[in-house]
Structures are given as structure tokens and as C-alpha cells.
């Protein structure tokens, strides 16, 4: 091994440094004798590593690792405008004028709730001339339950949320949707971001554990998962841990921490030792389905389930005994179909079989089945009558089985043990509480206080080459002082390592967590972050366009209680946010062609889900039901035929049950909804902070030919006809108000009426769905 603590002579590291093994290290020259002796003594004394190493880049030399400074805004009014204006003045750029009120109301609705305003909502704002009309509009939208659907979707991208496992089997995750609803609810309640992270990383280790905090731990469990049991493929555990670390790194810290799995990070000061200390903080996890019921309800469920199991087991034993003589009579005829050597092997008593005979006999005996209908045909009438009576009684008893208790698919750590008759598969907590899925086994907690299983440094990331045992820890370059590594709860039933990890992440001394989140919020309002690489604040990422503003926002975010809604208010009340997007200034274009300095508002194409939701809202078909189990919109049979495994509970008809908001669509990793995938739905296997935005021909083809779009165009036409029967001009005006939140101008009205003179109203409605103005926020 490279390093054997306590024995330098068996450590390849020492032997190569001393020239005892080839190739001698380091390359280019031998170490001094005193250095070689120091290495020998260090290894012989246990190779204790205190982590005191100078990183390649320190917090003093790289902007992202420095603690934020609450800079004084360089001007009056909204501090955002002061910081942005300073950069514009330095470049001699004149900003765009304010956008129209009609543009602003549509922008606000799409930004905050992901739905266009109705004509009445638009008119209400346009007619409200009070000085605080804009602020009151923002408050109404932040109070809407649809706010959580819109902004929760952004976090679900980061959390790589899906309703299936992925890979070749892509099995269903029947309780994953509860995590989605938790996220939506947390955004609606404006749960402070630091608490939001605590609940997701260590919701089972907090002082006050709630059903919501247990559901929240599904964040770490959202990884894609192969369909093999961990006990058969232990290396999979390291893949899941790597996914957790990658998600925490990219999604929370804005760092590619996973790049340090096999070696020190090539660009950022993240050591391989840091990676495995983080892994040790997570290593004790087990997947559990936390029952979301009170202890008394769980006890009652267990009691009734045990009674049903006992009675059904008793009846099945009687039934098997009744069938066994007939099964024994039918088996010889089935064995006779095999070659003579196989029949001979079966005929030899089990204790006397040779290894070869044991292999042959075992394969055949396990593979041969006598089916119930075969037994029925040879049974005596009185036995057949008794069999049917027993089967009916079993069915009757099964009907008394209590419904499965609701559970949260999350994680915990603790001394969980499989029951002797369990398959040793994925755990579910609490003896006697079953998971809703068919897989899994009963578990029970072991006695006493929890002992974390050992985790190891993996040499070159190889799970088969373990180095020194690791203790929990954090990324050194952004760690100040000596934060606790474990915060075990009083019960002692978990390690408290994840709680300590969460507290380190949300500590005011951590320079990245708040900085990354305010940058994400900024990105979703402006289409580009102050740091454009949302998931990478490291050396290979982009530098901030407004570093002083980013620092100020980070400190404000923490000072305002980590409130995301406070950040929305701050951003949306700025003149920077309210600027027009259509502003062709030659000087500004030449000095800042990418609009990095925000001299105008950045026009943005809507996300895939918002395009679908807007179509439903405009057609009048949108089902606004909040939360619950996922929906399964209709997918073409040809696409379903390509699905390898898993389920797609196709709706019987493309109707209201499937016309809910897109955040509730079943997210199958192996089969994204084609309509959404075309418009850049992100890969659900990895954390995604910023979606790709493409412009490809298939998007136009989908909007022209997709069955869903055509159906909604017809419903849109029906809505126009019902509102203004036979009056084409009123229908055109209403169509513009519904789809674009403005009336048509004279030229648009004339073109629309000319179109309707030759085409159907549904064709005109279809055209409205294809307009760039409908598909973009301006």
C-alpha cells in the first residue's frame, strides 16, 4: 500500500522516497537524508495528518474565498442601482429607459409565479396609479401559492429531483413527490435559506424534527440509482456519496468538489483529503422511509398489519399442505422432460449428491413450477372446494389490511439492522412499518448509542484501494477556526455529522453559501448571474461583473434572515430590473455587446415548463390544484414504445387531470416529457443551476404539430368564441390580451382579420402560441 500508518517499511511512499523501490521519487533528484528520515518517523508514528498545509490559492488571493464586505452603496436610492450605475458611468454607457407598465406586469408575473397575468390583472395594475402600485403587485405575487411552484422548480433543478431511479431499470420512486411538495411549501413560507439547507442535509438530526424536516432529507437521496442491492455491489455506495458531494459542491458552494475524488483539484485549492473528510461526514447514511404518522398511529398500523400477516400466513400454510400431495404427483412428469443425467441427479437423495449432481438438481428443482390450474385439474372435488374456500378467506382477510402509512423517502444514519428474513435490501425505518414500494425490508434500531462506520481515503478514488481511515471535516480553504465535526442529538441515535456539515455550510464565516444563492436569485431575474457560471465559482468559472454588489447582496441576504422573498423585493424594486429590453443604443452596444453591465433588461425565452403552463393558462384549461401525486400527460405511443423499463401511467384522456402545472409532471429519468425536453429540460441526473437555452428547428416543429398544442389551440379558440360570439375583432383583441397582455396595434389587427377571413379561429389561436412575444419575457 502507498501508506501504512505505523510501518514505514511497508509504505510504498517511504520506500520510493528513500530509493528502496523504483521509480525513485521525487523525479529529478533525491530528497535530503533528513527529509527522508522525517517521512519515516512520521509514518512510523502513525502518519497523523493535521491538515495544516498551505493551499495553492488562499482566501486572500481569490475573490470567491474571501469573506464578503458590506460595501457602502456609491449613491442614493436603491443600492442595486447605485452599484450598477457606477459601472455604467465608468464605461460611459447610458442605460435604457423604463419599460412600459404593461411590459412590467407581464415580466413580474412570469418571473414570480411563472404564469401570464389575466386581462383583468393587467388592467388592474395599469389603472392603479398609486405610488406604491408596483410594490403592492410584488407583494401579491409573493403571497401567491404559485410562487412556490415557480421558484421551487429552480431549486428542484439544483436538487436533481426525479420520480424514478434512472439507469436501465428506472424503477418508480413512489414517495419522491413529497420532497417536491416540501420544496414548494418551503418557498411559499419563505423558509430562511439557512434553515432550508439544515432541513435538507440533516432534517432528522435537528432539535425539533418534524414531518417536513424528514421529507426534506430526500434532497441527498435524489441521486440516480442502479437497480442492484448495495450488499451485492458495495461500490455503488461510493457513487451515491460522490453524487451527494457533487450536489452540495455545485448546488450550495458553487465548487466542483467532486473533481478531488481521485487527486487534488487541478485548478482550485480543494485537496483530495478535503473530499474524503466531506465523505466521512456523510458516510453513515442509510436510505429510510420515515413514517409520517404519530407513534400511536404507527403502533396501531403495526398491530393491525401483524394480525393480518399472522392470519394470512396460517391460511397459506394450510393451503400449501392441501396442495402439496398433488404437486408431488405432478413433478415427476415435468422432470421426465429433462435429459437422463438430470433425472438421475434429482433421484439421488440430497445428502448423497456429488457437487455436479447438486448443481444440476438445484437448477432444475428451483426452475420447475407446478401452476395452480394444473393442481386444480387433478384435485379431488372435496379438496378443490376446500382450496377455493381457503383462497376466498385469504382474500377476505387481505381486504382488512390497513392502507400503507404515508412515508417520507429520506435518509438518516444510525444502527439499523435487517431482520433475519429480510432480503437485505434498501432500509425502511421502524420495525413493522413497510414502505409503499414492493422493495425493501423491515429494519429496527440497535440498542445503545450510534457508532459511525469507518470510512477511508481511497487511493486514486479506487474503492478497492483503501488508505487511511478518515475523520469528518470540511474544505480547508473556506473553513475558519475549528467548527464542530459532530453535533449528535440527545438521543444518540445518529452521529450528528450531517448536522455539523449543515452548520458549517450556513455559517456566516463560510464565504460561499449565501454568495452562491444570491447569485442564483439574480440569474433567475436577469437571465445571467453576476457570476455567469452559477455552479462554478472556482478558477475555471467566470469572475463577477459587479463584485462589490455581489458582496453587498450576500451580506444583506444574511442580515435579512436569509429571506429569499426579501431579495426579490430588493431586486424587483430597482430601476435596473425595470429597464426596457428593446433599446438599440449604438454606443452601449459597442462598449458592452453582451449587456454584462445591465444597461438594458435581458430578453429571455421562457423555461420549458412555463411555456406549457402559459399555453394552458391562455387556453383556459389550466388546472391550478396545488401539490399531490405526479401527473402523467399523454405521450405518443411511438415514444412510449422506446421506454425500456418502468412505468408511465398514461392518462386515459388528455384532459384536466393532466393539465396541471408542469412542476407536477412525473419526472422519469429515462423518459422526459418530449414537449419539455425539446425546450431544454435539464438532465435530471446531475445538479443544474442554469439551464441551457437553445434555438433549434424541433422547437418550432413541436409548437406547430404537437397534439397538446393543437388541442389547447382549439380550446383557446372556444374560449374566444364564447367570450365574443361571431365578433372577429373582439376575438382578436381578446386573444392579444390573453396571450400577450396587450391590445393589438392597427397593423396587427388588420393582419389577424385578413388571416381569419381564410382560416379558422383555432388556426389563429395556434399562431398566437408560436409568437416570439408569447415565448419570451421582455
Annotate each PLM feature.
Residues 1-40, 48-86, 90, 102-107, ...:
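Solvent-exposed helix-loop boundary motif
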Residues 48, 52-72, 174-176, 212-217, ...:
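Primarily the internal scaffold of c-type cytochrome electron-transfer domains
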Residues 76-146, 161-210, 269, 313-322, ...:
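Primarily short, surface-exposed interaction patches in extracytoplasmic proteins
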Residues 227-232, 671-678:
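Active-site Gly/Thr loop motif
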Residues 666-669, 677-687:
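A structural supersecondary motif
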Amino acid at each position: 500500500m502507498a501508506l501504512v500508518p505505523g510501518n514505514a517499511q511497508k509504505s510504498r511512499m517511504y520506500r520510493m522516497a528513500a530509493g528502496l523501490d523504483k521509480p525513485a521519487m521525487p523525479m529529478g533528484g533525491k530528497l535530503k537524508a533528513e527529509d527522508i528520515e522525517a517521512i519515516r518517523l512520521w509514518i512510523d508514528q502513525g502518519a497523523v495528518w493535521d491538515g495544516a498545509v498551505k493551499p495553492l490559492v488562499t482566501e486572500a488571493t481569490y475573490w470567491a474565498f474571501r469573506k464578503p464586505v458590506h460595501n457602502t452603496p456609491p449613491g442614493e436610492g436603491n443600492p442595486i442601482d447605485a452599484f450598477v450605475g457606477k459601472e455604467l458611468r465608468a464605461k460611459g454607457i447610458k442605460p435604457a429607459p423604463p419599460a412600459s407598465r404593461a411590459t412590467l406586469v407581464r415580466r413580474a408575473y412570469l418571473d414570480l409565479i411563472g404564469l401570464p397575468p389575466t386581462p383583468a390583472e393587467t388592467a388592474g395594475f395599469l389603472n392603479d396609479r398609486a405610488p406604491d402600485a408596483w410594490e403592492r403587485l410584488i407583494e401579491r405575487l409573493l403571497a401567491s401559492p404559485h410562487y412556490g411552484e415557480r421558484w421551487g422548480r429552480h431549486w428542484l433543478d439544483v436538487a436533481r429531483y426525479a420520480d424514478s431511479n434512472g439507469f436501465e431499470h428506472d424503477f418508480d420512486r413512489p414517495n419522491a413527490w413529497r420532497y417536491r411538495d416540501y420544496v414548494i411549501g418551503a418557498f411559499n413560507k419563505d423558509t430562511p435559506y439557512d434553515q432550508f439547507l439544515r432541513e435538507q442535509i440533516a432534517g432528522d438530526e435537528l432539535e425539533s424534527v418534524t414531518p417536513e424536516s424528514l421529507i426534506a432529507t430526500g434532497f441527498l437521496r435524489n441521486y440516480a440509482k442502479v437497480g442492484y442491492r448495495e450488499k451485492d455491489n458495495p461500490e455503488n455506495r461510493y457513487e451515491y456519496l460522490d453524487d451527494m458531494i457533487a450536489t452540495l459542491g455545485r448546488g450550495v458552494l458553487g465548487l466542483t468538489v467532486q473533481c478531488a475524488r481521485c487527486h487534488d483539484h487541478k485548478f482550485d485549492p480543494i485537496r483530495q483529503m478535503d473530499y474524503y473528510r466531506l465523505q466521512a461526514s456523510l458516510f453513515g447514511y442509510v436510505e429510510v422511509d420515515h413514517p409520517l404518522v404519530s407513534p400511536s398511529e404507527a403502533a396501531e398500523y403495526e398491530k393491525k398489519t401483524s394480525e393480518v400477516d399472522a392470519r394470512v400466513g396460517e391460511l397459506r400454510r394450510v393451503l400449501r399442505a392441501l396442495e402439496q400431495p398433488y404437486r408431488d404427483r405432478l413433478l415427476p412428469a415435468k422432470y421426465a422432460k429433462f435429459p437422463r443425467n438430470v433425472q438421475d441427479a434429482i433421484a439421488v437423495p440430497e445428502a448423497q449428491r456429488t457437487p455436479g449432481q447438486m448443481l444440476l438438481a438445484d437448477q432444475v428443482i428451483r426452475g420447475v413450477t407446478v401452476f395452480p390450474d394444473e393442481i386444480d385439474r387433478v384435485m379431488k372435488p372435496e379438496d378443490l372446494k376446500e382450496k377455493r374456500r381457503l383462497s376466498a378467506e385469504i382474500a377476505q382477510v387481505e381486504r382488512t389490511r390497513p392502507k400503507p402509512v404515508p412515508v417520507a423517502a429520506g435518509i438518516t444514519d444510525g444502527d439499523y439492522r435487517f431482520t433475519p428474513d429480510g432480503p437485505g435490501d434498501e432500509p425502511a425505518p421502524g420495525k413493522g412499518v413497510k414502505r409503499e414500494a414492493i422493495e425493501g425490508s423491515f429494519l429496527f434500531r440497535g440498542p445503545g448509542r450510534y457508532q459511525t462506520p469507518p470510512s477511508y481515503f481511497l487511493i486514486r478514488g479506487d474503492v478497492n484501494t483503501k488508505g487511511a481511515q478518515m475523520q469528518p471535516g470540511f474544505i480547508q480553504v473556506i473553513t475558519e477556526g475549528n467548527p464542530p465535526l459532530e453535533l449528535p442529538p440527545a438521543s444518540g441515535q445518529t452521529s450528528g455529522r450531517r448536522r455539523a456539515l449543515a452548520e458549517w455550510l450556513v455559517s456566516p464565516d463560510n464565504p460561499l453559501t449565501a454568495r452562491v444563492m444570491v447569485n442564483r436569485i439574480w440569474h433567475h431575474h436577469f437571465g445571467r448571474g453576476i457570476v455567469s457560471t452559477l455552479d462554478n465559482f472556482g478558477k475555471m468559472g467566470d469572475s463577477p461583473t459587479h463584485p462589490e454588489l455581489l458582496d453587498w447582496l450576500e451580506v444583506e441576504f444574511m442580515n435579512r434572515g436569509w429571506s429569499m422573498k426579501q431579495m426579490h423585493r430588493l431586486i424587483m424594486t430597482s430601476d435596473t430590473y425595470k429597464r426596457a429590453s428593446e433599446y438599440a443604443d449604438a454606443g452601449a452596444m459597442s462598449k458592452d455587446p453582451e449587456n454584462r453591465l445591465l444597461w438594458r433588461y435581458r430578453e429571455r425565452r421562457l423555461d420549458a415548463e412555463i411555456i406549457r403552463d402559459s399555453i394552458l393558462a391562455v387556453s383556459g384549461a389550466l388546472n391550478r390544484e396545488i401539490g399531490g401525486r405526479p401527473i402523467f400527460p399523454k405521450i405518443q405511443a411511438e415514444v412510449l414504445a422506446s421506454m425500456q423499463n418502468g412505468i408511465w401511467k398514461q392518462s386515459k384522456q388528455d384532459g384536466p387531470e393532466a393539465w396541471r402545472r408542469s412542476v407536477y409532471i412525473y419526472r422519469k429519468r429515462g423518459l422526459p416529457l418530449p414537449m419539455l425536453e425539446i425546450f431544454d429540460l435539464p438532465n435530471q441526473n446531475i445538479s443544474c443551476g442554469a439551464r441551457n437555452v437553445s434555438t433549434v428547428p424541433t422547437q418550432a416543429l413541436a409548437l406547430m404539430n404537437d397534439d397538446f398544442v393543437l388541442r389547447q389551440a382549439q380550446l383557446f379558440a372556444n374560449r374566444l368564441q364564447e367570450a365574443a360570439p361571431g365578433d372577429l375583432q373582439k376575438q382578436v383583441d381578446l386573444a392579444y390580451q390573453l396571450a400577450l397582455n396587450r391590445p393589438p396595434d392597427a397593423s396587427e389587427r388588420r393582419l389577424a382579420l385578413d388571416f381569419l377571413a381564410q382560416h379558422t379561429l383555432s388556426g389563429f389561436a395556434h399562431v398566437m402560441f408560436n409568437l416570439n412575444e408569447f415565448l419570451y419575457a421582455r
